[in-house]
Amino acid sequence: MPTINQLVRKGRHSKTTKSDSPALNYAYNSMKKKMNYNPAPQMRGVATRVGTMTPKKPNSALRKYARVRLSNLIEVTAYIPGIGHNLQEHSVVLIRGGRVKDLPGVRYHIIRGALDTAGVDGRKQGRSKYGAKKG
């Protein structure tokens, strides 16, 4: 425990927290060819690869994912939630933060029902999370 004199001289340092979704924190200025710190809740991107991957140890499945080049030129791996999807290469998608616990390196989710991504067909409950219309 520090003495009062040590606290007067140095003070307390607050811990710096790392972002859970660092790619959403920067915007690219194409005129200046520079990255600016400009945090955003979502970001648009183009799918460069769509595929499946297998989850970590206790789980077993084929999880759908897309490799996305964002509008700030950063390329990330994003999870495609829900049953079935219509994404292919060059589809324009909207991503949000949020990792998938059993897929290493997947820190983003694709928002269903936005831009080129269709909502989940025949979904009755939790529709707003999957871009499904009523009925």
UniProtKB/Swiss-Prot annotation:
Protein name, per record: Small ribosomal subunit protein uS12
3-methylthioaspartic acid PTM sites in chain numbering: D102
Pfam name, any one: Ribosom_S12_S23
InterPro entries: NA-bd_OB-fold (IPR012340), Ribosomal_uS12 (IPR006032), Ribosomal_uS12_bac (IPR005679)
GO cellular component: small ribosomal subunit
Taxonomic classification: Bacteria, Bacillati, Bacillota, Bacilli, Lactobacillales
Protein origin, superkingdom: Bacteria
Segments for region (Disordered): 1-23
Molecular functions per Gene Ontology: rRNA binding; structural constituent of ribosome; tRNA binding
Organism for this UniProt entry: Lactobacillus gasseri (strain ATCC 33323 / DSM 20243 / BCRC 14619 / CIP 102991 / JCM 1131 / KCTC 3163 / NCIMB 11718 / NCTC 13722 / AM63)
Gene Ontology biological process terms in this record: translation
Keywords: Methylation, Ribonucleoprotein, Ribosomal protein, RNA-binding, rRNA-binding, tRNA-binding
Quaternary assembly: Part of the 30S ribosomal subunit. Contacts proteins S8 and S17. May interact with IF1 in the 30S initiation complex.
Gene name of the encoded protein: rpsL
Keyword rRNA-binding listed: yes
Protein family per UniProt: Belongs to the universal ribosomal protein uS12 family.
Role this protein plays: With S4 and S5 plays an important role in translational accuracy. Interacts with and stabilizes bases of the 16S rRNA that are involved in tRNA selection in the A site and with the mRNA backbone. Located at the interface of the 30S and 50S subunits, it traverses the body of the 30S subunit contacting proteins on the other side and probably holding the rRNA structure together. The combined cluster of proteins S8, S12 and S17 appears to hold together the shoulder and platform of the 30S subunit.
UniProt-listed NCBIfam families: rpsL_bact
HAMAP family: Ribosomal_uS12_B
